[in-house]
């Protein structure tokens, strides 16, 4: 079967936003207007629409399902324009900082993005975080200023904030008409027409009329700015415009705006209200006009599996004739199908029944069921092509971030790095009979989310959940209850401390055991040195002349590794150090791998104490947004939490305070902040780095864990 949709008609894009900007409403409206069974012009009464939404939720295919495929034809004047139908793959990205890891992996598979802003709040902290991530992946994007019906909505202030906060050049291509409860529609600056939504059909139909006299001057001014940005993309257009005042025609203008968006020269901006059903169709038109198809994206460069240097010299692009390659970017549990692996196909064709290679893990996988997720149903498919985003059921060894490829032409496309958890809680089922169910549920949640880990405490036997923040773990406990029907009790959150060393030492340890018959003997001499923060651990053997035979060196490494998981101070993992084995002694009869393992372990334990072992704690980057009158109290409170305030700046009519604060002092901060600011201040925090714990606190922690 040949490809049904040419690649130039594909748009793989994500919707990204701060937590309350109205992203979900936006996504739902997009699905509603593009819904296959509810095309524009045949939307039934509200009840049917809501039924469709409910059924969508019942089936678990709301827009939250990683990727949704839907279709859109450019529309003008309430009618379909004479452009072909485009295929939209919408990838959802969460809005909360505890889930920046989710955003990171979505951005790895997007071609473009729509950033949704709240017209009142503008560019918020999480918007900036996501924007920076999108910059890193060089994702072309446009902005939809949502909630123009809200009190205090200010479109032009949002345009200014985009430029101030992100450094991008914002170019409005559609300006809202009215604001708050007088929002009527928008002016399309490209065609210079008003789009007005009237009537009670949930925004499905609208009219285009000439711009009213009272708005002409403003429209001309902003159109001029838009054209200036557009003609910079083409020397001839620039010359015609500057010398003769000749404005480009509509088609040329759109292609110049597209060129500027794709080259990240500027960001097109539109406004509207998804909730009031105004402005969503022009947004969809703009996605088609300005965001990239898979053909507009540069080649994806990968490396050969097993190449330790990771030299990226293997190219893959959206071409059906190339060898198959794809990236698994999200795992979801579906009540009807089991585990679904959402995969972006970068090159080639994938058929049902194919055997493929998971090149990240070096494991073979067989393709069983393949599905296309539509807004209101899932479609079983036999084959998929470059540019598609599909769900694969029944993959055994594949997790988030793995590359899938043709075994004959292997490539690793992406190495996603997942941060270590910074917070942990003990969890147990309320009824003993649920223990098995809880273990299975946690294992499935951990398979979906690489930043979440589950471990068993060897001493207490407790199950420990580890994650990126309190909210992250709260939501996972809630999912245990909702999806796996397990009620759980959770302990107080604990900080994930680490241990390291202060300076280099040389240490020798001799292990001797004689108790009749053959004994045990091993001697090791090691140099233990600190490394730069974040460098991790490395081992090298500098043995010459066979003072420790080769076959015993794995025993030495094993002994060192056993100490890494449980440091000498309080039993926390040890990070950022290196060990060199420089000398040793052995006995022809009494030496063994086990004897050298014990010698290395004891040498490490004694050597680390000599090397000034110290405790490290996670430091969080905290941003508080507060009305000015509460600033003094909030700064004082952060300082009392051992925080270091690094700056403050005006943010709209509020103040933004930046600080670095130890995680240990941030538990339950939300409640303190609410009471200090009468509920008006808000904060976000994310992991920054590890720092040494002050001596007096370190002693308390050691006593607690001794």
Curated annotation (Swiss-Prot):
Keywords: Cytoplasm, Elongation factor, GTP-binding, Nucleotide-binding, Protein biosynthesis
Binding-site positions, GTP: 17-24, 92-96, 146-149
One of the GO BP terms on file: ribosome disassembly
Descriptive protein name: Elongation factor G
Domain tr-type G, first and last residues per copy: 8-295
Function recorded in the entry: Catalyzes the GTP-dependent ribosomal translocation step during translation elongation. During this step, the ribosome changes from the pre-translocational (PRE) to the post-translocational (POST) state as the newly formed A-site-bound peptidyl-tRNA and P-site-bound deacylated tRNA move to the P and E sites, respectively. Catalyzes the coordinated movement of the two tRNA molecules, the mRNA and conformational changes in the ribosome.
Protein family according to the UniProt entry: Belongs to the TRAFAC class translation factor GTPase superfamily. Classic translation factor GTPase family. EF-G/EF-2 subfamily.
GO cellular component: cytoplasm
Gene3D superfamilies noted in UniProt: 3.30.230.10, 3.30.70.240, Elongation Factor G (Translational Gtpase), domain 3, P-loop containing nucleotide triphosphate hydrolases, Translation factors
GO molecular function: GTP binding; GTPase activity; translation elongation factor activity
